[in-house]
Design a protein with these regions (language model features):
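Conserved phosphate-coupling serine/threonine residues in phosphotransfer and NTP-handling enzymes
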Residues: 69-71
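Asp-based, Mg2+/Mn2+-dependent phosphohydrolase catalytic module
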Residues: 1-37, 52, 56-59, 63, ...
Length: 172
């Protein structure tokens, strides 16, 4: 569409900032861990020291930590308590929280949507952490950026960087 000035129409020009890719992203407010793939099994793997450091880093940075799982609540709460103790995880969402305990519904991203709802944020302010590449599809179904991360590489800064890079790539 052209610009009309003094009775004449001329071609509209775009400004450089209209053509540039977005270089900012929303502030990371929460990291949602997939308990089924990202959290170690205490009985077999032992407590993950690196995971505790990562969660403490997120907690100190003011970033909420949430956990989702397709397993029953009692089992997941026990796992989280053994790994992280009490008070560091903002919310735990399990298959028991769904209207119908259906694994297919849980794998469609509904657990992540429910976690976002409980935290009161949108997918733009969260990052999902999974422990396997196959598990990346579930948070993506909920519109969440997701990363497959080795817990030894996880910190508040690395989560913020991964979140920012993911949204910038989406805008490009």
């Amino acid at each position: 569409m052209g610009v009309r000035a003094k009775g004449k129409t001329r071609e509209a020009h775009s400004f450089w900032w209209d053509r540039e890719t977005r270089t900012e992203a929303d502030v990371l407010r929460a990291v949602i861990f997939d308990a089924d793939t990202a959290l170690p099994d205490v009985e077999h793997d032992g407590p993950g020291i690196d995971l505790v450091d990562a969660v403490m880093s997120l907690f100190v940075a003011g970033i909420w930590v949430s956990v989702v799982s397709t397993r029953p609540r009692a089992e997941v709460e026990t796992q989280v308590r053994q790994l992280l103790g009490d008070g560091l995880v903002e919310t735990i969402v399990t298959i028991d929280d769904l209207p119908e305990p259906d694994t297919a519904l849980a794998r469609s991203g509904e657990l992540y949507r429910l976690a976002l709802w409980e935290l009161g944020i949108t997918p733009r302010a969260a990052l999902a952490v999974t422990g396997s590449g196959c598990a990346l599809r579930t948070p993506a179904a909920a519109g969440l950026p997701a990363v497959f991360v080795d817990n030894s590489l996880l910190s508040a800064a690395s989560c913020q960087q991964a979140h920012r890079r993911w949204w910038i790539r989406q805008a490009a």
